[in-house]
């Protein structure tokens, strides 16, 4: 599940479900593993790190105008699948409970994600938000969410070719919590991954916000791809401006020093670099009731 951040990937269907045995929560990782400076987080942990997620999401595709008209005509609600969401540092996993399979979504394939307010006045407090994720289409996504039928689109809008062109690139998926913030619900199995200690109240609208923030954090691990030619020209101008700046020794009120601020030389030495009438000095203040040396205590 660990991949190089610059590799191009596609969505996959896998049989792996994250558990306490094959993933580590972010809180557990921070307590047990030291942070190594200068080393990518993806290379520091042998196990994928769980940043967020939750149980009992209703997963499906955001209905287009055509699909909404079809559902209204046939009086059939849109198909939703009961699933669990896992936001890992390597990818986003959506576990389908009935299929016992996971949809693995690379972060580079996520075009945008947002919190969407459900347009239903009958919903209770704490159950009015859903998570929306727009991802690029690939063979797996096209198999799970086929493109709209062009013939039906022609009958509905008269512009089927345009509709097909605008829906080729991405698909918008929604994850709606099954339960509200304070609904009384007991899990079939004991929850040992999304515990209250690690993720707090992880249900309803709060769970949607937690998942959105977790995806936002993990997407920072995967920066944008190489810039275009227009963007590449900008660093050259910056480099030219930096090279045109005068030498640091010619600036006023600047002293050349390669030490640790404990080797300031006298005026006779510094006059070689700057003759502007200013003297170098350092002010230190010590308190009588505080020792200069102490001990570190781990809390």
Swiss-Prot record:
<dbReference type="Pfam" id="PF03517">
    <property type="entry name" value="Voldacs"/>
</dbReference>
<dbReference type="GO" id="GO:0005737">
    <property type="term" value="C:cytoplasm"/>
</dbReference>
<protein>
    <recommendedName>
        <fullName>Protein LOT5</fullName>
    </recommendedName>
</protein>
<keyword id="KW-0539">Nucleus</keyword>
<keyword id="KW-0963">Cytoplasm</keyword>
<comment type="similarity">
    <text>Belongs to the LOT5 family.</text>
</comment>
<dbReference type="InterPro" id="IPR039924">
    <property type="entry name" value="ICln/Lot5/Saf5"/>
</dbReference>
<dbReference type="GO" id="GO:0005634">
    <property type="term" value="C:nucleus"/>
</dbReference>
């Amino acid at each position: 599940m660990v991949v190089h951040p610059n590799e191009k990937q596609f969505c996959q269907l896998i049989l792996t479900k994250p558990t306490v045995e094959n993933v580590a929560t972010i809180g557990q990782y921070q307590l047990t593993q030291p942070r190594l400076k200068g080393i990518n987080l993806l290379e520091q942990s042998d196990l994928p790190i769980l940043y967020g997620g939750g149980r009992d999401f209703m997963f499906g595709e955001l209905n287009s105008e055509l699909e909404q008209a079809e559902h209204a005509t046939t009086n059939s609600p849109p198909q939703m699948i009961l699933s669990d969401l896992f936001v890992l540092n390597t990818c986003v996993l959506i576990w389908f409970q009935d299929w016992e399979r996971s949809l693995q979504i690379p972060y580079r394939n996520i075009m945008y994600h947002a919190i969407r307010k459900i347009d239903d006045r009958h919903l209770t407090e704490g159950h009015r938000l859903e998570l929306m994720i727009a991802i690029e289409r690939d063979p797996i996504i096209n198999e799970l969410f086929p493109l709209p039928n062009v013939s039906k689109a022609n009958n509905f809008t008269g512009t089927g070719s345009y509709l097909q062109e605008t829906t080729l690139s991405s698909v918008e998926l929604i994850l709606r919590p099954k339960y509200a913030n304070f609904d009384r619900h007991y899990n079939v199995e004991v929850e040992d991954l999304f515990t209250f200690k690690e993720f707090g109240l992880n249900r309803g609208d709060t769970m949607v916000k937690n998942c959105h923030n977790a995806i936002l954090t993990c997407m920072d691990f995967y920066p944008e791809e190489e810039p275009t030619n227009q963007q590449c020209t900008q660093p050259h101008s910056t480099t030219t401006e930096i090279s045109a700046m005068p030498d640091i020794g010619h600036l006023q009120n600047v002293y050349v020093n390669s030490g640790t601020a404990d080797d300031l030389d006298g005026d006779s030495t510094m006059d070689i670099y700057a003759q502007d009438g200013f003297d170098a000095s350092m002010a230190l203040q010590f308190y009588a009731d505080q020792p200069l040396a102490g001990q570190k205590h781990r809390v």
